[in-house]
Amino acid sequence: MWKQKGAQGNDPYLYSTNNFVGRQYWEFQPDAGTPEEREEVEKARKDYVNNKKLHGIHPCSDMLMRRQLIKESGIDLLSIPPLRLDENEQVNYDAVTTAVKKALRLNRAIQAHDGHWPAENAGSLLYTPPLIIALYISGTIDTILTKQHKKELIRFVYNHQNEDGGWGSYIEGHSTMIGSVLSYVMLRLLGEGLAESDDGNGAVERGRKWILDHGGAAGIPSWGKTYLAVLGVYEWEGCNPLPPEFWLFPSSFPFHPAKMWIYCRCTYMPMSYLYGKRYHGPITDLVLSLRQEIYNIPYEQIKWNQQRHNCCKEDLYYPHTLVQDLVWDGLHYFSEPFLKRWPFNKLRKRGLKRVVELMRYGATETRFITTGNGEKALQIMSWWAEDPNGDEFKHHLARIPDFLWIAEDGMTVQSFGSQLWDCILATQAIIATNMVEEYGDSLKKAHFFIKESQIKENPRGDFLKMCRQFTKGAWTFSDQDHGCVVSDCTAEALKCLLLLSQMPQDIVGEKPEVERLYEAVNVLLYLQSRVSGGFAVWEPPVPKPYLEMLNPSEIFADIVVEREHIECTASVIKGLMAFKCLHPGHRQKEIEDSVAKAIRYLERNQMPDGSWYGFWGICFLYGTFFTLSGFASAGRTYDNSEAVRKGVKFFLSTQNEEGGWGESLESCPSEKFTPLKGNRTNLVQTSWAMLGLMFGGQAERDPTPLHRAAKLLINAQMDNGDFPQQEITGVYCKNSMLHYAEYRNIFPLWALGEYRKRVWLPKHQQLKI
């Protein structure tokens, strides 16, 4: 059986800044589990397949991890009897209290011993294939991946194949060329054959048919072209230039990569190395076979130069501008021929040397986690090409388990983990219940994790020269070892520490030193845009919109420059206002000015219908929930703010007949609110709307819409306190969705806890913030 492990480092090429607190990985133990437990796992796998067929639910429920942690906790989840409200029965205090207690008990049971809540953070079908390609070209695929790994990786790909035979870019998406080609290639590299696939339904052959019916792999978007070129089943001549020489320009250069969004910068960095070296792996019999399998004409007859701008229409979301195509053509026809010849090839060598220097620095400062799975796979490819026997390659291999996640739908590569983000949201949800004394042990563990996850030092040396920012005092999305600042994680973590500081230390643990709070404030104030007043994610926003014209991805939007985001801005307002409340006098004027600018940014970016567009969740419901919470913390209310009134009106106008809310993922690329098909309800999104309405004062004015939504949540709760997994609710870059498996527990608990506190409990002393 598979076992989830955590807070351990068992490899000489692993190292940590905090003794691996927050690390999570999976290990196969052949002798683990009773026959009954193994049967439960198989049942979970069958239930997933049936649920997907009957109800169209693609995301996993994380059943393998949950079953393990629930058993290890020893908590009896069925000791509180289930509760259902009849059609004509109204919500009452006892009903909501029972639902909250059951949800709290489940959350205690699935909390890891180091304080975080392990959960899948995945959903993209573009995450895993690059890693498999990296392992294949380096000859390590059979040493890093066991038979059990391969079996579960294959299971995942088969489970998420679409009816038409193709695969999407993410698990709920329509079939695309990049999703289909990469999934097909991955299956073949893992040993699946053409004649008959293990699923008994000819899945490999059906996938190949979709690819050929839609023009063949030559139409794969640019990221896919790079991956295939490294594997050796596409020619570099068919890729638009990614010159490493760009890294040699002074930082004042208008198009210097240092001005790019960190994830874009760090992804294209190893891409430019691989392009500059024209590297490809060994041309094996399987590679030669793939060359013939995925194209409509013989490989030798393909005119590669004509494929540089070729992108399948099913994939195209962000078309190249004419200016961009002229830039690529100019580099391809004029620069590249010179850089291949002496003496200009010396410039290429200098560019490659600089890229290697930057890759090494970035990998070291993230403990070889890198900024995410995209860079991770590309760095593995690059270090294999640079020095197969080097320590960098070995360090990278040692961190691969951190990216592999297994659930009932199989094994996949996840982002880099959402440990900190899930923990700080869950912590606020627990605090909102007002049952702290009853469930304080859970808060004590979460408190420990949050404190241990704060970054304690800046990157070493001249980090600005290495395209990095200061980090001391910040929190990441995952754990301290990741080392990359995230604005909303820092703000929400700061608020958690401030909330917990008002509670008895014998219940929630010791407070952090106040200097740690000051350092977090320093980070937040630094991250604000001096122009707009908004906040981005990793670094201060870059007011260089012309750079977005060079977005080469075709499938993602807003990836080139660091942009402000609604939800990040709202979270920072919450964090700064909470700090000001408990620590007046420290940088008070700067905090007040910062919050005032941030509020103006939010007011300027409100949609005509009263909503706000969220970048990291779907989408208008998500953005509006965060914004109203930010406004509430800054004293903006329904009575004194037109923006709040419009936001509340948006929520009330989009509530469906059964009392819930549901928003389709189509809202994200279209940037227009789109209800779920049939105007059905999503429980997580319903919770967002409930919370947003309560932050907008709806409980005091007219709680009727909240009663309807609360009844829906109570009746949807399962006997063990869990809530059913429904549609995917996360997103990034407007056109790719992300599954946050813990959301279905965090947000219904938070919404019901806040509802119970605001509607049903008598007025009494609350926390100050």
UniProtKB/Swiss-Prot annotation:
Pfam families: SQHop_cyclase_C, SQHop_cyclase_N
UniProt-annotated catalytic positions: D488 (proton donor)
Cellular compartments annotated: Endoplasmic reticulum membrane
Transmembrane segments: 612-632
UniProt keyword Lyase, yes or no: yes
Inducing factors: Up-regulated by methyl jasmonate. Induced by N,N'-dicyclohexylcarbodiimide (DCCD) in a nitric oxide (NO) dependent manner thus leading to increased ginsenosides accumulation. Induced by A.niger mycelium-derived elicitor, thus improving ginsenosides production in adventitious roots culture. Triggered by vanadate. Induced by Tween 80. Accumulates under heavy metal stress in the presence of CuCl(2) and CdCl(2). Influenced in roots and leaves by relative humidity and photosynthetically active radiation (PAR), and in leaves by rain.
InterPro entries the UniProt entry points to: SQ_cyclase_C (IPR032696), SQ_cyclase_N (IPR032697), Squalene_cyclase (IPR018333), Terpene_synthase_CS (IPR002365), Terpenoid_cyclase/PrenylTrfase (IPR008930)
Gene Ontology annotations of biological process type: response to metal ion; response to molecule of fungal origin; response to vanadate(3-); saponin biosynthetic process; triterpenoid biosynthetic process
Biotechnology: Transgenic tobacco plants coexpressing PgDDS and PgPPDS1/CYP716A47 accumulate dammarene sapogenin (protopanaxadiol, PPD).
Stretches forming PFTB repeats: 457-501, 518-563, 595-635, 644-685, 706-747
Alphabetically ordered keywords of this record: Endoplasmic reticulum, Isomerase, Isoprene biosynthesis, Lyase, Membrane, Repeat, Transmembrane, Transmembrane helix
GO molecular function, one term: lyase activity
Primary residence: endoplasmic reticulum
Membrane topology, from the record: Single-pass membrane protein
SUPFAM superfamilies membership: Terpenoid cyclases/Protein prenyltransferases
Disulphide-bonded residues: none
Annotated site, Transition state stabilizer, chain positions: W421, F477, W616
Any one GO CC term of the record: lipid droplet
Tissue: Expressed in flower buds, leaves, stems, petioles and roots.
Subunit structure: Monomer.
Function according to Swiss-Prot or TrEMBL: Component of the dammarane-type triterpene saponins (e.g. ginsenosides or panaxosides) biosynthetic pathway. Oxydosqualene cyclase that produces specifically the 20S isomer of the triterpene dammarenediol II.
Family: Belongs to the terpene cyclase/mutase family.
Protein name (database record): Dammarenediol II synthase
